[in-house]
């Protein structure tokens, strides 16, 4: 599977089999899965009170594996076939009663690949250049160029919006 570098995002629904997807979703939506609060979504200086989210780091290039749940991602790695990981993290955006669109950002300033995997269906979305808006749909993978500006939004029809972002070569 190839992530686009200069193309429009690629969407693949039903990315994982139910046998691989269900345990991953159960883990991230479980009562004991650790989520960590961040007061800004896009950049550190974005301190609007409604622009917060929760994250969980699975892997970071300078630290390596950072989560006991990392092994649950192997079915995704088997399909993405990364040569090297930069970062893998889960994002959880709380329903705030209205849709909040976060500021545009790039994940890293250098050329690499990106994949965004949705854990639940909701009316939250990810926005890309050329007014491309892709809804969060359970078990949907979006392959995109994360060094180009993009932004997220919250949802209003579910308690949370949860996805996993993969940055890799």
What positions do the PLM features span?
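A short beta-strand-loop-beta hairpin characteristic of the jelly-roll/cupin
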Residues: 98-104, 110-112, 118-137
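Short beta-strand segments enriched in hydrophobic/aromatic residues
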Residues: 92-94, 119, 168
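A short hydrophobic beta-strand segment most commonly corresponding to one strand
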Residues: 115-117, 158-169
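Conserved metal-binding segment of the jelly-roll/cupin
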Residues: 95, 134-151
């Amino acid at each position: 599977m190839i992530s686009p570098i200069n193309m429009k995002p690629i969407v693949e629904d039903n990315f994982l089999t139910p046998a691989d997807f269900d345990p991953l979703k159960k883990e991230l939506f479980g009562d004991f899965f650790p989520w960590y609060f961040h007061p800004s979504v896009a950049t550190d200086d974005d301190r609007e009170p409604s622009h917060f989210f929760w994250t969980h780091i699975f892997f970071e290039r300078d630290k390596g594996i950072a989560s006991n749940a990392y092994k649950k991602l192997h079915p995704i790695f088997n399909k993405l076939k990364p040569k090297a990981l930069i970062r893998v993290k889960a994002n959880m955006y709380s329903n705030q009663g209205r849709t909040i669109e976060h500021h545009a950002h790039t994940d890293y300033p250098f050329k690499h690949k990106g994949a965004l995997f949705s854990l639940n269906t909701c009316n939250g979305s990810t926005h890309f250049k050329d007014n491309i808006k892709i809804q969060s749909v359970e078990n949907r993978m979006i392959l995109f160029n994360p060094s180009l500006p993009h932004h997220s939004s919250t949802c209003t029809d579910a308690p949370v919006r949860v996805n996993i972002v993969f940055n890799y070569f």
